[in-house]
From Swiss-Prot:
One record GO biological process: adaptive immune response
Organism: Homo sapiens
Alphabetical UniProt keywords: Adaptive immunity, Cell membrane, Immunity, Immunoglobulin, Immunoglobulin domain, Membrane, Secreted
GO CC term (a single one): plasma membrane
Name of the protein in its database record: Immunoglobulin heavy diversity 1-1
Parts forming coiled coils: none
Subunit structure: Immunoglobulins are composed of two identical heavy chains and two identical light chains; disulfide-linked.
Compartments, as annotated in UniProt: Secreted; Cell membrane
Functional summary from the UniProt entry: D region of the variable domain of immunoglobulin heavy chains that participates in the antigen recognition. Immunoglobulins, also known as antibodies, are membrane-bound or secreted glycoproteins produced by B lymphocytes. In the recognition phase of humoral immunity, the membrane-bound immunoglobulins serve as receptors which, upon binding of a specific antigen, trigger the clonal expansion and differentiation of B lymphocytes into immunoglobulins-secreting plasma cells.
C-alpha cells in the first residue's frame, strides 16, 4: 500500500 500526507 501507500501512505502519505
Amino acid at each position: 500500500g501507500t501512505t502519505g500526507t
